Amino acid sequence: MRRFCVVPLLLVLVEAAQKSDLGGDASAALINHSPMLIQRLQDLFHKGNSTDTILRIRTANSDEVKVIHVHQLLLTLQSDIFDGLLLNQSEVTLQEPAECAALFEKFIRYFYCGEISVNLNQAIPLHRLANKYHMTALQRGVTEYMKTHFSSESAQGHVVSWYHYALRMGDINLQESCLKFLAWNLSTIMSSNEWVTVSDKLMVSLLQRSDLVLQSELELFSAVEEWISKNKPDAPVIEKVLRSIRYPMISPSQLFQIQKESAVLASYHNSVQDLMFQAFQFHSASPLHFAKYFDVNCSMFVPRNYLSPSWGSQWIINNPARDDRSLTFQTQLGPSNHDTSKKMTWNALFSPRWLPVSLRPVYSESIPSSSQSNRLEEGKPRLVVTSAMSGMDFAGVTFQKTLLVGVKRQQSKVFVKHVYNVHQSTDEVFDFLLQADLQKRTSEYLIDNSLHLHIIIKPIYHSLIKAK
């Protein structure tokens, strides 16, 4: 549970006036009894002394009416909506959904003390109330709470419902934050109760993305098939969803298997027949030869972020602030059946405090050692991934390195917080582990004092001169 503490407008004005009174007098002092005033305001609300307005809260399809006695000044000072509603009125009736009505007294208490507690189930109704009554600071506070609690445990899950709510409210920022979390933790979402609550629109949006983090494209197909079976969307939606699966990223043997065993694919075979045929063609030739005849500059041939060992390696770095670390691992050359047996070797180097050569200290007896040490402490985390197979040239393909940073293990799960795409080094992005503070054992980026990374190598194909 999180509490938001916002000083009411009245106290802000009082504090500003007090500071102005001090002027430049060095002997002046500020006596601050704001907490006592807040406590008295809370007591005023709880005891109902000297109230001048009555709020009646009704809920649709219910005869129950909640009555709250309030002080009009405190509401109208902070909400222009209440200012309009209570103009020349001492009693108003408000219609609220049941979940909002249940929290309305708590919401009104916020006007008196500037503080409110919130949990996962209360986030949407509180955000809705803050939005309706133009309580901007509270709305921002609840939004930030939601963004920092995507990975919190809940029985039914909550990020999908938060996305759908943000979509209805037109909150683009919250929508994007929810989408990003869902995309980067899709394997976890697909195995949770949330998966069947995904709407048609959200499913289509997710499947368009190349940054989905999951074990394999086959895992995605199986989860999508389950979603179709349980939700039974309209035929056009099913066709669009099935055509968003990247079949070339599935091996030929697995393609044969789903063709034979998938009931959904059997029903909609004609809708994806061309894509399946193209996938088999992709696997039957080298990517270089395939690119001469087909356009590979489309999403169908762009790998997503697959966690299986053939695509990269997990890297758990214990005590990452200590010193440089290195890792050597192998991946397949590419997803084509022509390349899966060919291996690429990669070297990764992690530096917790890296400085460009131009900024590195010059060690000299004339320069205090403390200054040299301070300069080193100014370095930032850096990760470089290079091929160990120097001199090899691959026409028509470049290798993108995708770096996943995991945080907040819950029930043995590691959630992805950041995804970085680089050609070789994190120097190419400005914010790699910028807020991590790896020297603090309490850093949210450290799980049992270890930094959890996953390196994925993604071959990106490019069209060549087409054969005539």
From Swiss-Prot:
CDD domains: BACK_BTBD17 (cd18493). It is found in: Secreted. Keywords: Secreted, Signal. Residues 1-16 form the signal peptide. The keyword rRNA-binding does not apply. Residues 51-120 form the BTB domain. GO terms for cellular component: extracellular region. Residues 159-259 form the BACK domain. InterPro entries: BACK, BTB-POZ/Galectin-3-binding, BTB/POZ_dom, SKP1/BTB/POZ_sf, TRAF_BTBD17. The keyword Metal-binding does not apply. PANTHER family: BTB_POZ DOMAIN-CONTAINING PROTEIN 17, HL07962P-RELATED. This is BTB/POZ domain-containing protein 17. The gene is btbd17.
